[in-house]
Amino acid sequence: MKKYRDHYFLKAKQENYPARSVYKLKEIDNRFKIFRQGMKVLDLGAAPGSWSLGAAEKVGPRGRVLACDLQETDTVFPDNVTFMQENVFERSEAFENLLDEIAPFDVVISDMAPRTTGTRFTDQARSLELCLEALAVADRCLIKGGSFVVKIFMGPDVQELVQAMRQRFSAVKSFKPKSSRAESKETFYVCLGYRGVETSDTDK
């Protein structure tokens, strides 16, 4: 096991996080200041729960985190986190109702990743699909001026996502945290200042 992996793996265990990925979110927030006390956060692809725990710390007891994932998790969350086992591609009526109850969200974060096949092109295409679905959820429930953070496996089609995000946000920044593994193809896009979906005259 590589030294940097040892460091973040052990650090997560020592600080009672279920996964090392929380340090990626912490780096993102340190750089871009996306969280504030009292905010409402939607966490897509939340299991095993490290990002939700990290976000919950940042928004505090007056804030709220709605976490969802296809997989169940046995992580014990604080009172300001609600976890729901859910497929964001097939959002149930119960999930839609919960979105309506809590929305609008100040921040939508997505650490979703596909089951990898070992075929880079396939994995990248599936990652893009997840990112676009996360963006569609953000369109559904993100407040104007809000922020969106999404992970993608880099590939030739990433510009499709970047263009879609630039149509919606005042600023779109790419960022690879130091806590990401060096060989990983993942990159995070941090989008600030949500404007909404711009509609052309022909679409009106």
From Swiss-Prot:
One of its GO terms (cellular component) is cytoplasm. It is an enzyme of class 2 (transferase). Its EC number is 2.1.1.166. Keywords: Cytoplasm, Methyltransferase, rRNA processing, S-adenosyl-L-methionine, Transferase. One of its GO terms (molecular function) is rRNA (uridine-2'-O-)-methyltransferase activity. It comes from the Bacteria. S-adenosyl-L-methionine binds at G49, W51, D69, N87, D111. It is found in: Cytoplasm. It holds the Pfam family FtsJ. InterPro entries: RNA_methyltr_RlmE, RNA_MeTrfase_FtsJ_dom, rRNA-MeTfrase_E, SAM-dependent_MTases_sf. The active site is at K151. It catalyses: uridine(2552) in 23S rRNA + S-adenosyl-L-methionine = 2'-O-methyluridine(2552) in 23S rRNA + S-adenosyl-L-homocysteine + H(+). Specifically methylates the uridine in position 2552 of 23S rRNA at the 2'-O position of the ribose in the fully assembled 50S ribosomal subunit. Belongs to the class I-like SAM-binding methyltransferase superfamily. RNA methyltransferase RlmE family. This is Ribosomal RNA large subunit methyltransferase E. The gene is rlmE.
